[in-house]
Amino acid sequence: PTIYHWPEALAQAADMTVTCPGCSMHYYYDFIHPETEAHHCPYCTTPRPQVLILESYRWKGTDTPLELPCWRYVREIPPGSELTVPRRVFDEFLMLDSDTAEVLISSGDEGILIKKSDHAKADVSVAADSHPQRGFQTVYSQMKIDRATPDVQFWMFSNMNSPRLVKCMISGSDK
């Protein structure tokens, strides 16, 4: 890409890397080690840690099928930690505020907690199979999703400048 596009390209690349808990090196989350044929670090073969994978799709309405994700954001999410999800997951990439926190996600044995950031501009709604009420529910302050299995999936919807449907998956270290 030309220099004008470097910030976005570098952010996209960085957003798809994880840090190895064994050697602290960074690598792409979907790397499959040729020796182990599993998601292991390419440098020391330590299994990939538990990760949160967010795939952001441009929403064009219910009559239009989803295209390929326009953004992917992947981070390690150890139990008990809180992960900051930046604005670029919910809207177009902008140099000035793409790193601004929109949502905070924490994972524990009892469930997933989704909280709006103090600086959030997005109106976020969440839908999950494990949530007692079916369909999308608006997150006013925070929302809890029950964790029935180690690998959890839920959806977030944001209607900013460019409406986004975000598929959220928590994947264990053995996946």
What are these regions (language model features)?
Residues M16-M25, I53-S56:
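Disulfide-bonded cysteine-rich modules in secreted/extracellular proteins
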Residues P1-V18, P49:
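Terminal C-lobe "cap" of eukaryotic-type protein kinase domains
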Residues V51-D109, T138-V139, N161-S162:
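N-terminal beta-hairpin/loop module of FHA
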Residues A13-M16, H33-E37:
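Residue-level signal for mature regions of secreted extracellular proteins and peptides
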Residues K116-H119, S125-K175:
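C-terminal boundary/linker segments immediately following FHA domains
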Residues H26-E35, R48-Q50:
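Cys/His-rich microdomains that often coordinate metals
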Residues W6, A101-S106, E110-K115, A120-V124:
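Short hydrophobic/aromatic patches on the structural cores and recognition surfaces of FHA
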Residues C20-C23, A38-C44:
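Short cysteine-rich clusters marking metal-coordination/redox-active sites
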